[in-house]
């Protein structure tokens, strides 16, 4: 109901010369299509709901898992810090999102957190718009469908050592860029336009988070074993066991802003 009201308010205050956000963009798209071809209002509300839902719990979960993997994969943390951020960006400023291509190992690290521990094992419910057949199975129109992302992202035929955290798998042979072909196999990118957009935003946020935190700070584990730290807690989105002992240290003396 909250999102429905917000979307309708956008419609009432819509100005084609002042596109404020994605909701306005959806209304503009609707208004520019011929009568009969435009998306119904309900579909726009559902699209906004998908984007809102995909960016709410999953972003915080992704941030939490990425921080946990910085702790449990110290060699990856060190490589992000020393081989990329210190070298490509320097210590005098923060990196920009437009510079992500200069930090391929960091981006590969983010990609690796998705299949290793799939934050959302099953997608939210989808519905078929027509009768269809998939791999010999008949799926009728308006059938509720859940996609098992966990299975796809841990399929041995698609992934080498799917349960092993290995950042390098997403890099090209010369380690200078992301392997586009392999990265597109990550199921999280293939569950619909709205979710794809939201997941792309999630990846930007995690990238920004790591680029802000790791240049100046190093994260280290406390007393638990590595196995205990990454033990998952199952739910609609999968979280890790709470880490009771956690250390964050300055990498070097920071200059005063005064």
UniProtKB/Swiss-Prot annotation:
EC annotation from Swiss-Prot or TrEMBL: 1.14.14.1
The EC category is oxidoreductase
Report the locations given in the UniProt record: Endoplasmic reticulum membrane; Microsome membrane
Q: How does it sit in the membrane?
A: Peripheral membrane protein
The cofactors named for this UniProt entry are: heme
This entry's comment on induction and repression of expression is: By 3-methylcholanthrene (3MC) and estradiol-17-beta.
One MF term in GO for this entry? oxidoreductase activity, acting on paired donors, with incorporation or reduction of molecular oxygen, reduced flavin or flavoprotein as one donor, and incorporation of one atom of oxygen
Name the reaction it catalyses.
Answer: an organic molecule + reduced [NADPH--hemoprotein reductase] + O2 = an alcohol + oxidized [NADPH--hemoprotein reductase] + H2O + H(+)
Annotated Gene Ontology cellular components are: endoplasmic reticulum membrane
One matching Pfam family is p450
- InterPro entries referenced in this protein's UniProt entry, alphabetically: Cyt_P450, Cyt_P450_E_grp-I, Cyt_P450_sf
Question: What does it do?
Answer: Cytochromes P450 are a group of heme-thiolate monooxygenases. In liver microsomes, this enzyme is involved in an NADPH-dependent electron transport pathway. It oxidizes a variety of structurally unrelated compounds, including steroids, fatty acids, and xenobiotics.
Q: Family, per the entry?
A: Belongs to the cytochrome P450 family.
| Name of the protein this chain belongs to | Cytochrome P450 1A2
């Amino acid at each position: 109901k909250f999102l429905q009201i917000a979307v309708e308010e956008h419609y009432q205050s819509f100005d084609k010369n002042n596109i404020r956000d994605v909701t306005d963009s959806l209304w503009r798209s609707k208004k520019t299509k011929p009568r009969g071809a435009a998306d119904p209002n309900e579909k726009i509300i559902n699209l906004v709901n998908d984007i809102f839902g995909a960016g709410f719990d999953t972003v915080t979960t992704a941030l939490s898992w990425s921080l946990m993997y910085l702790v449990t994969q110290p060699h990856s943390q060190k490589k992000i810090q020393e081989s990329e951020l210190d070298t490509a960006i320097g210590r005098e400023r923060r990196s920009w999102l437009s510079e992500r291509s200069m930090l391929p190992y960091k981006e590969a690290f983010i990609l690796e957190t998705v299949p290793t521990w799939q934050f959302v094992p099953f997608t939210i419910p989808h519905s078929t718009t027509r009768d269809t057949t998939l791999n010999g199975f008949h799926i009728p129109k308006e059938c509720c469908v859940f996609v098992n992302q966990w299975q796809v992202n841990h399929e041995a035929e698609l992934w080498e050592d799917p349960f092993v955290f290995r950042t390098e798998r997403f890099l090209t042979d010369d380690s200078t860029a992301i392997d586009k072909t392999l990265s597109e196999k990550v199921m999280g990118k293939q569950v619909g336009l709205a979710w794809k957009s939201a997941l792309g935003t999630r990846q930007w946020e995690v990238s920004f988070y790591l680029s802000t935190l790791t240049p100046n700070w190093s994260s280290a584990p406390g007393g638990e074993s590595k196995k205990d730290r990454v033990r998952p807690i199952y739910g609609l989105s999968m979280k890790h066991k709470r880490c009771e002992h956690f250390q964050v240290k300055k990498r070097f003396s920071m200059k005063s802003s005064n």
